[in-house]
Amino acid sequence: KFAQSFVGHINGGLALVCVLVACFFAAISGSGPATVAALGGIIIPAMTSVGYSKGDASALMATAGGIGIIIPPSISFVVYSSIANVSVGTLFMAGIIPGLLMGFSLFAASMWVTRKAKLDRVPKATAGERIDAFKDAFWGLMMPVIILGGIYGGIFTPTEAAAVAAIYG
């Protein structure tokens, strides 16, 4: 609802919702496959209902979910840090910019591909609807901030961050 209220009204908006939600979910779960499994069953039917082909919707969901391996807290970063004896906080910091760039690039590619498509759009949300959607999503959006901020700030270790996430969630 949050993502759709901000970008659902533009052409290709549901593709942007797919990318935005996948990036947020990946930032929470740390796993690309978990992102696709959790969101694919919801987003792909929604996209096909407004005119996307099933193949396009599935490909976009898989690609957006693949960003999860880069966006902190990535499970791959945790595994690599333990094998290579590298700070997981440093790896997380190194993944922020590439993850954001990949997300923005997928946004741009989605907009370019759907620019001439005749897809159904969601009516534009009012300012009040956007504020309500933000209020509803606020605590969920704060989870990555709390977890990553705690790790980067030295407040807790990645293992303790997992416990905080379990309690917070």
Regions found by a protein language model. Name each.
Residues K1-G169:
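Alpha-helical transmembrane segments of multi-pass membrane transport proteins
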